[in-house]
């Protein structure tokens, strides 16, 4: 059971939001940020009524640890299971996952991808889970690609 938990199998349960927060800590040099959904509120005339700024919740890892994870996650995109994201006009770092659940012999695994773009000065984090759909590289990465592409092409 312990080894299954260490590789994300068995009884390990996490939400896409939780995984996005952990990934943002890597992207932010080890700082776990307080999540927020609204950047600013504007009046009907376009005047900013209230704006919100990113806040550090706590230090989750050292800058060196975050840098090493970024390097490894960049490798996943450049030459690994996330390679569909390479050469798209932005840099990305990420990790795919294919999570077995239930009776693994009779169910289709959950497809995961977590990552961030503009590696040197990160812009956004994306967390995708497609339940009972297959592998992370075949299902979750193309979904993440559409999100990143929409962000940079709008």
Regions found by a protein language model. Name each.
Residues 1-56, 64, 73-154:
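Active-site beta-strand/loop architecture of penicillin-binding DD-peptidases
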């Amino acid at each position: 059971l312990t080894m299954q938990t260490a590789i994300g199998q068995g009884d390990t349960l996490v939400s896409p939001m939780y995984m996005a927060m952990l990934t943002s800590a890597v992207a932010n040099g080890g700082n776990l940020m307080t999540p927020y959904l609204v950047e600013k509120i504007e009046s009907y005339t376009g005047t900013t009524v209230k704006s919100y700024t990113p806040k550090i919740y706590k230090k989750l890892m050292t800058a060196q640890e975050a840098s090493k994870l970024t390097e490894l996650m960049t490798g996943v995109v450049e030459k690994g299971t996330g390679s569909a994201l390479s050469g798209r006009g932005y840099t990305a770092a990420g990790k795919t996952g294919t999570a077995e659940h239930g009776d693994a012999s009779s169910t289709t695994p959950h497809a995961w991808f977590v990552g961030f773009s503009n590696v040197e000065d990160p812009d956004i984090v994306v967390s995708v889970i497609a339940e009972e759909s297959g592998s992370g590289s075949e299902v979750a990465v193309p979904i993440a690609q559409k999100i990143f592409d929409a962000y940079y092409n709008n």
